Amino acid sequence: MMITLILFTTGIVMTTLVIPQNKLWANAISQSALLSLSSPLLIFSNHWSAPWHNLSNILASDSISAPLIALSCWLAPISLIASNNTISKQSELNQRTFIIIVIFIAGALIITFSALELLLFYVAFETTLIPTLILITRWGAQMERFQAGLYFMFYTLFGSLPLLISLIAIYISSSSLSIPNVELIWTPSETMETLNIWWALSIIAFLIKMPIYGFHLWLPKAHVEAPVAGSMILAAILLKLGGYGLIRLINLFATISLNSLSLALITFCSWGALVTSIICVRQTDLKALIAYSSVGHMSIVAAAIFSSTNWGTNGALILMIAYGLVSSDLFSLANTVYERSGTRTLAITRGLKTILPLSTLWWLVMSAANLGLPPSPNLIGEILILSSLIAWSIWLFPIIGLATIFGAIYSLMIFQLSQQGTPTNNINNISLSFSREHLLATLHTLPLILIIINPISALITWLK
């Protein structure tokens, strides 16, 4: 199945190179839509009683990777639809390049999430860097995009070398880089101090990619300067690479007692979630606010993964998928406001409910999902995460509780500041909503509804 998806993305790239200009976008969107519709077969065909499915020497899926692969494929046509309005006005070469980059990122993500070999995982993990950098620096709106690209590249490369050194050390110690083999046969003989340093070096790249608070400086810049497709892919999928990598490495290091490091990491991540929630309350830029909320959510996800509990890991996976869809739609909605008003400042983009009443409904739904109101999947993930963290240490309750309260405040603030009040003069004469924009919101909401109906599709049922 993974080979089919990878060949499918290759076919879309080849078709994009040769198809006539007048059929370019229709072809790319329709083919990527077929890709997204075929990807859920991974979830429904997965044997939930077994760790791995569709096993080959280098590619396989399990209940951790299958939902993330489906999410990657699902977001490919959505990001193309969101960008069609602006990119289609550019030159033919720019349009073809943009489509190829988006599909290439989707293919790299499929390989990353389905890689059985740690070295292949590392190569595919780093392959997403250059296309994303091109999206930010080439199609960003302002000159600050070059600084944002520099931050993104520097932070990502900074964490890559320690991860590569760690993988080489794992190969020397276990004589294998196959994930199932390493999980079964690896019994490191190093001292606890050495293993703690080893573990810390291994996770730096993933903490930067998520990112958690303290490693997050590149993310708000990248989100603010990236085009809408870049922001959607970055928020929905690329940040989840960090969480996925942490889950895989936690399983590899499962035979080692890492309680001393877990205490520091969980405390730091929980505190980071609280700090970023407070930062969100003080934001005036709409995209920066959504970007900082991503940092807060991913800090909570990291804390849950470090708890090494079944509830924590399941909650982390559900929240990664659900918040990936919610944040992607929030960036899409923010882009519709920016296209009409030319600004992202919340003090200016107010009173939209009188001009775009149907869009106000989508803002309300996504703001409610962002703060975790029932019956959204975000609530399920947050309950599992909070339960696992409080069971791990009752002293985390005040920190997590305050982070949740501030999360509710800024989620409601997003809706109130953008929709309530009297419209300013510069947005009184804006155009009404397009069917394309409502289609985007519907395509983001539909998977959330499916997860509500069948939450088992996002659970790791074989974890012990």
From Swiss-Prot:
Reactions this protein catalyses: a ubiquinone + NADH + 5 H(+)(in) = a ubiquinol + NAD(+) + 4 H(+)(out)
GO CC term (a single one): mitochondrial membrane
Entry's transmembrane regions: 1-21, 63-83, 98-118, 119-139, 152-172, 197-217, 227-247, 261-281, 288-308, 314-334, 355-375, 389-409, 443-463
Keywords linked to the UniProt accession: Electron transport, Membrane, Mitochondrion, NAD, Respiratory chain, Translocase, Transmembrane, Transmembrane helix, Transport, Ubiquinone
GO biological process: ATP synthesis coupled electron transport; electron transport coupled proton transport
Organism: Paracentrotus lividus (Common sea urchin)
UniProt name for this protein: NADH-ubiquinone oxidoreductase chain 4
Function: Core subunit of the mitochondrial membrane respiratory chain NADH dehydrogenase (Complex I) that is believed to belong to the minimal assembly required for catalysis. Complex I functions in the transfer of electrons from NADH to the respiratory chain. The immediate electron acceptor for the enzyme is believed to be ubiquinone.
Record flagged with keyword Mitochondrion: yes
Domain of life: Eukaryota
Main subcellular location: mitochondrion
Nucleotide-binding among keywords: no
PANTHER family: NADH-UBIQUINONE OXIDOREDUCTASE CHAIN 4 (PTHR43507:SF20)
